[in-house]
């Protein structure tokens, strides 16, 4: 999808405020919902993915199962709200041995397991909004001893709220981020009466 696109800086694949946030995504819902709502904490539109079973409610990109993203930028960044329920996401990458590897992170697992084609790992989320930063190049090297070439697919499962999902060429400090890539929490008015 993005193979022939010049890739530097930031490449966003989901922005909850956009006119069609799931334009390049496919949705699967069983016993749950995927809808856009206003989050009270940030007073802004977000995408809510909720389901009784994490494996049957998710969004996946690209929408066409035969296509791949072709994103070479090595950092995946997701701005996600912890709903204090089970949550998992999965990223499929291609390495320099031409092997497709999957990385699955979840908040209900306690150990990391590396198998030939999938690496599952625990993820701890803070209360409220989180910025998940995933160094795909480093994970590929540490888990498989190979080099990251590109990201093929991203799948985000229930249960979470999503503000933005993007790739970047490196990790940026808060000051370096473009305004629309930051998560603004409304300033609490602490004036004393």
Curated annotation (Swiss-Prot):
It holds the Pfam family CFA20_dom. Keywords: Cell projection, Cilium, Cytoplasm, Cytoskeleton, Microtubule, Nucleus. It is found in: Nucleus; Cytoplasm, Cytoskeleton, Microtubule organizing center, Centrosome, Centriole; Cytoplasm, Cytoskeleton, Cilium basal body; Cytoplasm, Cytoskeleton, Cilium axoneme. Disulfide bonds: none annotated. GO terms for biological process: cilium assembly; positive regulation of cell motility; positive regulation of feeding behavior; protein polyglutamylation; regulation of cilium beat frequency involved in ciliary motility. InterPro entries: CFA20/CFAP20DC, CFA20_dom. GO terms for cellular component: axonemal microtubule; centriole; ciliary basal body; cilium; motile cilium; nucleus. Cilium- and flagellum-specific protein that plays a role in axonemal structure organization and motility. Microtubule inner protein (MIP) part of the dynein-decorated doublet microtubules (DMTs) in cilia axoneme, which is required for motile cilia beating. Involved in the regulation of the size and morphology of cilia. Required for axonemal microtubules polyglutamylation. Belongs to the CFAP20 family. This is Cilia- and flagella-associated protein 20.
């Amino acid at each position: 999808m993005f193979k022939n696109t010049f890739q530097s800086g930031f490449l966003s694949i989901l922005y909850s405020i956009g006119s069609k946030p799931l334009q390049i995504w496919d949705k699967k819902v069983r016993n749950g919902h995927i809808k856009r709502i206003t989050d009270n904490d940030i007073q802004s539109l977000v995408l809510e993915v909720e389901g009784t079973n994490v494996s049957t409610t998710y969004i996946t990109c690209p929408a066409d199962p035969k296509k791949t993203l072709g994103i070479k930028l090595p950092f995946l960044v997701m701005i996600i709200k912890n709903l204090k329920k089970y949550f998992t996401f999965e990223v499929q990458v291609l390495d320099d041995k031409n092997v497709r590897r999957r990385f699955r992170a979840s908040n209900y697992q306690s150990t990391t397991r590396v198998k030939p084609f999938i690496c599952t790992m625990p993820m701890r989320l803070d209360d409220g909004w989180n910025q998940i930063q995933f160094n795909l190049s480093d994970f590929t090297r540490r888990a498989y001893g190979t080099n990251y070439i590109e990201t093929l697919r991203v799948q985000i499962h229930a249960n979470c709220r999503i503000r933005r999902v993007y790739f970047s060429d490196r990790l940026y400090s808060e000051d370096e981020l473009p305004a629309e890539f930051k998560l603004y929490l409304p300033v609490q008015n602490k004036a004393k009466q």
